[in-house]
Regions:
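Conserved phosphate-binding elements of NTP-dependent enzyme cores
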Residues: 1-825
Length: 825
């Protein structure tokens, strides 16, 4: 009986030629600090081999139509089943994607409405449900005798024939934002009061406006209503004007047509061809709910069929919990002969919905736009989609499924994993969350450190084995012996000593009207179960309100007021990847590369050969490698095989031509190194080399403080993990005085080992020491314990959430019986 997969000689990324046996039909956890090679083993070896072997069994013709995985660098992998992976960061879907389309629940629902609903004849009469629809026969109205066909499921889809004509199925329309046309009404029209004429139109428009009878030399607020109306909505008349050019002595006369302010924007919008043009127009537009479909995205015809008395758009506005109850009553509401068909359609709906409910997504409505969901919600949508077919003998690789999950939601996730194993599948789980790792039957711990010092298996065994072995780094956290409280927290009395930020909001999504206070100069953590409104409150209310206040623009519609004395900057540090192409590296992003280029240009070698700082750029300089244009890799197009990206044969991945190796820089210890060699060092080694070079060593030191000492300077930023990207974005902020800044972090502990969380807390402390106000959305209990002030949202998700349950120190939250978070602290 084969009961384990055998991996021999794995060398993917930083794996050090490791041999490991992985039990089959079990939950196997892979743990280790960030960058220790967990994902390399799980995704780079097991998933890559499992999916590649399965695809290789298909014909060339079929394979040509699929994205293909290249062979992993491993000597052999035996007994690996066909594999499915759930990645750490599902991409953010487009405007057309909703919770209903993403989970494919809407497919079953549309089918119900097409086959089982009561349809409307062209004259407006409703016909009782009939089997004739499924048979594809013509329907006849019993009242007026009209003949017509019922809509198919496709005609009820807002991404095809069922789309609302006005908004094209997106549910929102762009209209001119009147408030943005004259942002400052103390200016005169000559002084540039009408913003679109300054940026989208010739400045001559002010002269034409004067000819239309508007005074252009008085402040805009002193104009009569009639004059303002001409500015906003005046007719397109031709006027004869004299003009005098501002910067030369030329003058002349012209016939010119008047474009009012609103038409100027509409005309520019109609001519937009690219993103750059859109950016110029965008600031004069606002998104409004479509007036015809009221945001439901469906045409009037698609909203016509009724089932159990409600239309499709009304069904999509129900939460999943309510909808499941409603669907249960559908077969009983139909004539006897239609029930078997109804039951099979409803069953398909219920089985998909059950998984989503298990994962705690019952509070979402089907019409919720998928781009407004949090990372954790999108990831669980993806998980539910993968596990709803009761397969057997498949390897599921889950990359950090606990992201965005409150401790109370993890229970549903562990249930799904145990179900998969019970069906005869194997689950590989890459995670740091001790609560979810405790569910694993076997744990493999990678390490001992990150990057080049990682890639070894330090310990493997059951949870009890890890707790007992002293070399295990996660063992103390599993057994609860590790010290997790790292900083002194402010007491209740001194909490608002530096002042506070007050926010008052109306209701939005599932969040009820809120009154909220955030202490300045403290670490505030916003907690709550998934769907309790943390993202909505912080990212859609607090951040836009602060931005509006700082820029002096109008507050978002659902914000009543914001009071924030002395705040001049708000910085959102999220975990989205940095850059999309291979040209962005750690050194360029952290501003180290520019400084190094200046240093190299001053070196004796460079002066002798006549190189300037610009020559040392691997993107545009003369010293970049001509073979790959400075990207370090070349793409080969091979018929019938996937495009192969290989390391550039000329520069071997260094991005520089041979001449660059001839220019060396000498440090204090009289070691000489060329720029391509320096770019191959990690931050720690580079810091040792650049000891006496002030600016460079300061910037490298910052990266080291952020716990990124193991990254190589030439590493491309898109390949960094979420947690690494987030800390790299902070590099430019550490060390400055930040008393006027608010930093907002969205789940920064994502992908962080308990030891890395301690590094993160030190980073927060560095910001607080400089006077910053830090607001964090977080589930990690170690981060919550170290907060000065906790705002707990809830008590549940969706309709049963959306208010502040408790606010205070972590101790006060723990004693609050209503708070679900408090139970786990």
């Amino acid at each position: 009986m084969i009961d384990k997969m055998l991996v021999r000689g794995a060398k993917v990324h930083n794996l050090k030629n490791i041999d490991v046996d992985i039990p089959l039909n079990r939950i196997v956890g892979i743990a280790g600090v960030s960058g220790s090679g967990k994902s390399s083993l799980a995704l780079g070896v097991l998933y890559a081999e499992g999916s590649r072997r399965y695809l290789e069994a298909l014909s060339t013709y079929t394979r040509r139509r699929m994205t293909q995985a290249s062979k992993a660098s491993v000597e052999e992998v035996l007994y690996v089943p066909a594999a499915l992976a759930l990645h750490q960061r599902p991409g953010v879907p487009g405007i057309r994607s909703t919770f209903g389309t993403g989970t494919e629940l809407l497919n079953s629902l549309r089918l119900m409405y097409s086959r089982l609903a009561s349809h409307r004849c062209p004259n407006g009469h409703y016909i009782p449900p009939t089997l004739a629809v499924a048979a594809g026969r013509e329907l006849v109205c019993p009242e007026c005798g009209a003949h017509f066909y019922a809509p198919s499921a496709e005609e009820l889809a807002f991404n095809s024939q069922g789309a609302c004509q006005k908004c094209g199925g997106t549910g929102s329309v762009r209209t001119v934002d009147m408030a943005s046309l004259v942002p400052d009404d103390s200016l005169t029209i000559d002084g540039g009061a009408v913003a679109p004429w300054n940026s989208l139109m010739w400045s001559l428009m002010t002269d034409v406006c004067r000819e239309m009878g508007v005074r252009t030399d008085v402040p805009f607020r002193d104009l009569t209503e009639q004059e303002k109306d001409i500015v906003y909505h005046g007719p397109a008349e031709k006027k004869h004007i004299f003009y005098h050019a501002k910067n030369s002595n030329q003058a002349g006369e012209l016939d010119f047509t008047y474009y009012n302010a609103v038409y100027t924007v509409e005309n520019a919008l109609a001519k937009v061809k690219d993103d750059k043009g859109m950016k110029r127009v965008e600031k004069f537009l606002r998104e409004d709910v479509c007036p015809e479909c009221h945001g439901s995205r469906l045409s009037a015809a698609a909203r016509a069929p009724k089932l159990r008395g409600i239309s499709l758009d009304e069904a999509c506005q129900m939460t999943l919990e309510a909808l499941v109850e409603w669907v249960k009553g559908v077969p009983g509401s139909l004539p006897e002969e239609m029930r078997p068909m109804a039951e099979s359609i409803c069953e398909a709906f219920e089985s998909t919905a059950k998984r989503l409910m298990d994962l705690g997504l019952g509070y979402l409505t089907l019409d919720r736009s998928a781009s407004t969901l949090s990372t954790g919600e999108r990831q669980r949508m993806q998980l539910a989609r993968a596990v709803r077919n009761r397969t057997t003998g498949v390897l599921y690789v889950l990359d950090e499924p606990s992201i965005g999950l409150h401790p109370s939601n993890i229970v549903g996730l562990t249930g799904v994993m145990h179900d998969l194993v019970a069906d005869g599948n194997s689950v590989i789980l890459v995670d740091h969350d001790t609560q979810i790792l405790k569910e694993a039957d076997w744990v493999i711990e990678m390490g001992p450190e990150a990057g080049a010092k990682g890639g070894h298996v330090i310990v493997e065994g059951t949870i009890a084995d890890l707790e007992a072995k002293p070399e295990s780094q996660i063992g103390p956290f599993l057994s609860g012996k590790a010290e997790t409280k790292l900083r002194r927290c402010a007491g209740t009395g001194e909490m608002f000593a530096e002042g506070g930020i007050h926010l008052s909001t109306g209701s939005i999504h599932t969040v009820k009207p809120l009154e909220l206070d955030v202490p300045k100069g403290r670490l505030t953590v916003v907690t709550g179960v998934s769907g309790s409104g943390k993202t909505t409150m912080v990212l859609e209310s607090l951040v836009p309100a602060l931005e509006a206040k700082i820029n002096g623009s109008a507050l978002p519609t659902h914000i009543r007021e914001i009071r924030a004395e002395g705040i001049a900057h708000v910085k959102l540090i999220d975990a989205t990847p940095i850059g999309i192409n291979v040209r962005s590296t750690v050194a360029t992003y952290a501003g180290i590369h520019d400084e190094l280029r200046k240093l190299y240009a001053r070196s004796p070698d460079a002066r002798q050969k006549g190189f300037k700082a610009s020559d040392f750029s691997y993107n545009t300089g003369s010293l970049r490698c001509p073979g790959c244009d400075g990207t370090g890799e070349v793409s080969l197009d091979v018929q019938f095989l996937p495009d192969v990206n290989i390391v550039c044969p000329d520069c071997r991945g260094s991005r520089y031509a041979r001449a660059a190796y001839g220019v060396k820089l000498m440090n204090k210890a009289e070691q000489a190194v060329s720029l391509p060699q320096l770019m191959e060092m990690d931050v720690n080694s580079a810091l040792a080399f650049c000891g006496g070079m002030k600016t460079v060593s300061q910037r490298l030191q910052t990266l080291q403080q952020l716990g990124l000492g193991y990254l190589t300077l030439g590493e491309e930023t898109p390949s960094l993990s979420g947690g690494e990207a987030q800390r790299l974005k902070l590099a430019s902020e550490i060390g400055r005085t930040q008393t006027d800044s608010v930093f907002v972090f969205d789940e920064p502990s994502i992908g962080l080992h308990p030891l890395d969380v301690q590094v993160l807390l030190r980073v927060f402390q560095a910001l607080l020491d400089n006077g910053a106000t830090v607001v964090v959305i977080e589930h990690d209990l170690d981060v919550i314990r170290n907060a000065d002030y906790v705002i707990d949202m809830g008590p549940g998700g969706g309709e049963s959430g959306g208010r502040v349950v408790a606010a205070g120190t972590p101790e006060e939250i723990r004693e609050n019986s209503e708070s679900i978070t408090g139970r786990y602290l």
